[in-house]
UniProtKB/Swiss-Prot annotation:
This is Protein RER1 homolog. The gene is rer-1. Belongs to the RER1 family. It is a multi-pass membrane protein. Signal peptide: none annotated. It is found in: Membrane. May be involved in protein transport along the secretory pathway. Keywords: Membrane, Protein transport, Transmembrane, Transmembrane helix, Transport. GO terms for biological process: IRE1-mediated unfolded protein response; protein retention in ER lumen; protein transport; retrograde vesicle-mediated transport, Golgi to endoplasmic reticulum. Its main location: membrane. It comes from Caenorhabditis elegans. The chain crosses the membrane at residues 35-55, 57-77, 135-155. The keyword DNA repair does not apply. GO terms for cellular component: endoplasmic reticulum; Golgi membrane. The keyword Cell membrane does not apply.
Length: 191
């Protein structure tokens, strides 16, 4: 047998590889356009919500995707290195004194914004797809799910805010910090 024939990828693997390359190309093109990406995400979310309202069903799918959105949002708000674990590790023994509490450290997210958007979109598209299949429409009393979702959201966000207050970090930045020069403190004397 010819070994060169076995080493060539099959037709299906070449097809899926070309799809993967095209998908990554379009993701790379969308990366710098944050506002546009989130507008697309909100439009898809409104479409999903309108399907839930018009069909008057698939409440379990909506609840599951809502819990997933909450989990993604919490990962987005959480720092990549948990300060609670840092403070627990400091009890290992005597160390030289340092002043690391006042030191500036940039906020690094556990889930970056692009991955947050990408996971959000995948979950929304999967949820929209689930609404086309009848076996995902499990009969359930939806007010209980709504109440439980709001209680769960309130408790988890309260815990996250308390964590942010305790370890003094802010996960949101408005923009790039700008350097300012010294302010003029006196008059110019012309002599």
């Amino acid at each position: 047998m010819d070994d060169g024939l076995r080493d060539r990828p099959g037709v299906t693997s070449r097809f899926f590889h070309s799809l993967e390359v095209k998908y990554q190309y379009y993701l790379d093109r969308l990366t710098p356009h944050t506002a546009f990406r989130w507008v697309i995400a909100l439009i898809s979310l409104v479409f999903f919500a309108s399907r839930i309202i018009l069909l008057q069903g698939f409440y379990i799918v909506a609840y599951a995707v809502g819990i997933y959105y909450l989990n993604l949002f919490l990962l987005f708000l959480t720092p990549s290195i948990d300060p609670a674990l840092e403070f627990e590790d400091e009890d290992d023994g005597p160390v030289l004194p340092s002043k690391t509490n006042d030191e500036f450290r940039p906020f690094m997210r556990r889930l970056p914004e692009f991955k947050f958007w990408h996971s959000f979109m995948k979950a929304t598209l999967i949820a929209i797809t689930c609404t086309f299949f009848e076996f995902f429409d499990v009969p359930v009393f939806w007010p209980i799910l709504v109440m439980y979702f709001f209680i769960l959201t309130f408790l988890t966000l309260k815990r996250q805010i308390m964590h942010m207050i305790k370890y003094r970090y802010i996960p949101f930045t408005v923009g790039k910090p700008r350097m300012a020069g010294k302010e003029d403190t006196g008059k110019v004397v012309v002599g």
